[in-house]
């Protein structure tokens, strides 16, 4: 997001002025990136990245070990926990130290690159100022051409109208005014662009400060997130065991509470039934009392009122008990729902933990075995021997022994001979290309010198012509003024025409000479530009060829290094030391040091490791798959095998088709004979009857 904002702000800011190219941005940008040495910083960043990846892998391994040790510590008995606590605490302390070292290394790497890039100037203003300067220059050149055209028109008018001195003065005044206006416009544009450049620099400084603050905040947040993740991991482990214990306790408590609530509900129901029975009994007594005597109404009013009061009181008690039962049932339902929700949560947590445990088990199962690790170690040692020459002779003997070693020796010797032949051919080609490049560079320098000389002569000739033309104009103007002041307008027309006829003829002849010379110079300039273009294309082609040959030489140097290391370990003991010395003498010290540096910079251990991994996958295949793969490679890689397989398949198809044809013919003949016999039998049968 920050990069896009920077780009949008760049697009919104106006381009710098033409004078800014002569000020600080362009030389500052060029000096900074020249001193920055980007290739060196890339190599340092690659090393730091590899180290960071290695530290991450080591930390993951240590964390797994600590997790296993903590798991063992929790499973251990209390007597063994005291003895295991010190080692576990020491492991955690070592892991904390390693994490702090990782953090310090990452912070130092970030601060180093940040300190170097903090003072980096933005190349956009310089490039924009150059583009704006080119645009302004093209505009000024177009205006200059227009002014030259106008000046030429004015001069032609002046040659035809020499008597109109007022017109000439007016045009000259207009020219001066236009020049002054142009200078003022240029000054205004320069001032505006300088102000815009200052504002843009201020904005870029503010943006850089904001970006620095944002990066610091991000770093702080990353540190806080790392610490919180560690704490959350520890809390999650503690909460898992606590939740299991709490779930067991809560299930037991909930069951006891449910049983108590059920007992209370049963007691309330029994009490409700007794009260309802009493209510019915009292109602029956009241009805019997009303039916027995009407005379005793006055006497029984008090008893009825008492009975009604007791009945209402009992009804209130019954309603209260019903409300209590309803409340107890709702509370019981809520408790059941909460208990079910908690059980679901606990089950989900347990399922998550079980899935995590299953993933950890799968990851442990996918880990390589001890045998595979030993094989990989051997391969890494062989890779070190091939790439870095950092293995001892004993390890090399253990890695490659017996018949495989003899086969490898023969193959390496054959490759060594081929590479020597290729190296000699490439040296010859390189010398030829270098000589051609030197010739082309010399020719290009000669042509550039010739072009510069011709440009200098053209400039000198134009200056001389302008000087001569200006002096003639000044002399003619003075003479015209003097003649005009001495004589009348009518009298001076004839001598003026007579005097200016030869001057106009001289000017026309001089213009013809200048035009012809200009055409010749233009033709020569076109020829030189075309030749320079061809030479540039040739130089580009030669540089590409030189880069290709350099890359081929680096590859050959790597192969020769491999052969030298192998011969140094094995072949020297068998009496081929002289051969190795002859091989080493093929390179001079300077060339060897140069290609050694390029080769060491371009070493990529991951390519060799991927090759070893591919070979390991091929070894892990079944016998049938390996036989199929090797036979396919053999058939596709050998010319004679391909031709043999082609003709073999054709012959096999021809044989199969001939066999099928003969079998079909035999079957047809046999069926035909049986049919003839059957027909003869049928014809002879009635005669026999």
UniProtKB/Swiss-Prot annotation:
Biased composition (Basic and acidic residues): 65-76
Residues forming coiled coils: 79-367, 410-467, 514-556
One matching Pfam family: CUX1_N
Cytoplasmic side: 1-643
Sequence positions bearing N-acetylmethionine: 1
Outcome, altering residue 648 to L: No effect on subcellular location when expressed in tobacco cells; retained in the endoplasmic reticulum when expressed in mammalian cells
GO BP term (any one): intra-Golgi vesicle-mediated transport
Cellular location(s): Golgi apparatus membrane
GO-annotated cellular components: endosome; Golgi apparatus; Golgi membrane; trans-Golgi network
Keywords: Acetylation, Coiled coil, Golgi apparatus, Membrane, Transmembrane, Transmembrane helix, Transport
Presence of keyword Nucleotide-binding: no
Membrane-topology descriptor: Single-pass type IV membrane protein
Residues passing through the membrane, by range: 644-661
Region (Disordered): 1-27, 49-76, 278-307
Topology, Lumenal side: 662-689
InterPro entries linked: CASP_C
Chain's role: May be involved in intra-Golgi transport.
Family, per entry: Belongs to the CASP family.
Protein name, entry field: Protein CASP
Lineage of producing organism: Eukaryota, Viridiplantae, Streptophyta, Embryophyta, Tracheophyta
Gene: CASP
């Amino acid at each position: 997001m920050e990069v896009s904002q920077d780009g949008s702000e760049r697009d919104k800011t106006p381009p710098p002025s033409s004078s800014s190219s002569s000020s600080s941005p362009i030389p500052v940008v060029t000096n900074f990136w020249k001193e920055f040495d980007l290739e060196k910083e890339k190599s340092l960043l690659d090393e730091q990245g590899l180290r960071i990846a290695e530290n991450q892998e080591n930390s993951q391994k240590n964390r797994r070990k600590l997790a296993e040790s903590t798991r063992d510590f929790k499973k251990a008995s209390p007597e063994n926990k005291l003895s295991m606590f010190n080692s576990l605490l020491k492991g955690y302390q070592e892991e904390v130290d390693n994490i702090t070292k990782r953090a310090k290394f990452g912070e130092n790497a970030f601060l180093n690159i940040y300190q170097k890039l903090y003072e980096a100037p933005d190349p956009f203003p310089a490039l924009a100022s150059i583009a704006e300067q080119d645009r302004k220059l093209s505009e000024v050149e177009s205006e200059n051409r227009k002014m030259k055209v106008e000046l030429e028109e004015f001069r032609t008018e002046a040659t035809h109208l020499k008597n109109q001195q007022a017109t000439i003065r007016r045009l000259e005044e207009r020219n001066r005014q236009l020049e002054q206006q142009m200078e003022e416009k240029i000054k205004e544009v320069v001032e505006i662009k300088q102000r815009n450049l200052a504002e843009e620099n201020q904005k870029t400084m503010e943006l850089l400060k904001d970006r620095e603050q944002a990066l610091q905040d991000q770093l702080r947040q990353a540190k806080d997130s790392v610490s919180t993740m560690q704490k959350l991991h520890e809390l999650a482990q503690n909460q898992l065991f606590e939740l299991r214990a709490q779930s067991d306790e809560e299930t037991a408590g909930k069951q006891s509470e449910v049983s108590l609530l059920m007992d209370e509900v049963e007691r309330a129901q029994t009490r409700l039934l007794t009260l309802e029975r009493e209510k019915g009994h009292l109602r029956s007594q009241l009805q019997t009392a009303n039916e027995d005597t009407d005379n005793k109404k006055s006497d029984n009013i008090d008893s009825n009122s008492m009975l009604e009061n007791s009945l209402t009181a009992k009804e209130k008690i019954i309603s209260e008990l019903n409300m209590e039962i309803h409340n107890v049932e709702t509370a019981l339902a809520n408790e059941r729902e909460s208990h079910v929700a908690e059980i679901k949560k606990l089950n989900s947590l347990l399922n998550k933990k079980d899935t995590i445990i299953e993933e950890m088990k799968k990851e442990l199962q996918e880990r390589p075995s001890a045998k595979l690790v030993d094989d990989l170690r051997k391969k890494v040692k062989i890779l070190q021997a091939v790439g870095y020459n950092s293995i001892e002779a004993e390890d090399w003997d253990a890695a490659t022994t017996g018949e495989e070693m003899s086969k490898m020796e023969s193959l390496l010797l054959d490759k060594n001979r081929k590479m020597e032949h290729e190296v000699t051919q490439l040296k010859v080609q390189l010398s030829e290309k270098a000589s051609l490049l030197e010739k082309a560079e010399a020719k290009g320098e000669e042509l550039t010198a010739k072009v510069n000389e011709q440009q200098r002569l053209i400039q000198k000739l134009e200056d001389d012509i302008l000087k001569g033309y200006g002096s003639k104009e000044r002399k003619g103007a003075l003479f015209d003024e003097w003649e005009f002041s001495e004589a009348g307008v009518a009298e001076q027309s004839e001598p003026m025409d007579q005097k200016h006829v030869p001057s106009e003829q001289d000017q026309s002849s001089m213009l013809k000479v200048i035009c012809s010379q200009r055409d010749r110079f233009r033709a020569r300039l076109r020829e030189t530009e075309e030749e320079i273009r061809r030479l540039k294309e040739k130089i580009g082609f030669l540089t590409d060829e030189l880069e290709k040959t350099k890359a081929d030489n680096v590859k050959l140097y790597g192969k020769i290094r491999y052969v030298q290391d192998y011969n140094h370990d094995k072949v020297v003991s068998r009496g081929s030391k002289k051969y190795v010395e002859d091989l080493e003498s093929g390179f001079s010290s300077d060339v060897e040091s140069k290609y050694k540096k390029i080769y060491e910079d371009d070493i990529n251990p991951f390519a060799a490791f991927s090759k070893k991994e591919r070979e390991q996958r091929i070894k892990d295949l079944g016998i049938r798959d390996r036989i199929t793969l090797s036979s396919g490679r053999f058939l596709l890689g050998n010319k004679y095998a391909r031709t043999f397989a082609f003709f073999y398949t054709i012959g096999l198809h021809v044989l199969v088709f001939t066999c099928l044809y003969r079998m079909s013919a035999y079957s047809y003949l046999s069926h035909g004979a049986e049919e003839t016999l059957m027909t003869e039998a049928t014809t002879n049968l009635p005669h026999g009857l």
